[in-house]
A protein has these predicted regions:
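Acidic/His- and Gly-rich active-site-bordering loop/insert found
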Residues: 1-75
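Alpha-helical metal-binding/catalytic segments enriched in His/Glu/Asp
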Residues: 65, 75-104
Length: 104
């Protein structure tokens, strides 16, 4: 729930609107978590974050998952971030079980 604390509202939701300091804080936190999970991080010109877990076949097409880390002004705790964190949880589960994948 560390992410939910960033921009937490009195109503129990989150307010991390795009391009704000709170959005940056959430993005930095996610990048730290992804690096801790062994992912490489790339950020494109638009600010999209690509966290990549290496596969045994670097030429294979990657498995993709995506969502967003910013919220609407009255977004709930899981507005957007749920999909991002679900993908990171899959990576952490693969790592914890010692499972390698051919696709990045």
């Amino acid at each position: 729930m560390e992410m939910a604390k960033i921009g937490a509202t009195k109503a129990g939701g989150s307010n991390r609107q795009a391009l704000t300091d709170l959005d940056r804080e959430g993005r930095d936190l996610f990048c730290n978590w992804a690096r801790d999970a062994g992912c490489s991080i790339e950020i494109d010109q638009m600010g999209n974050i690509f966290a990549r877990r290496a596969g045994t076949d670097p030429g294979a097409s990657p498995v993709l998952a995506g969502s967003h880390l910013d919220t609407q002004p009255t977004g709930g705790k899981f507005d957007g971030v749920y999909g991002v964190l679900a993908a990171l949880e899959v990576i952490e589960t693969l790592n914890d079980s010692g499972t390698s994948t051919s696709r990045p």
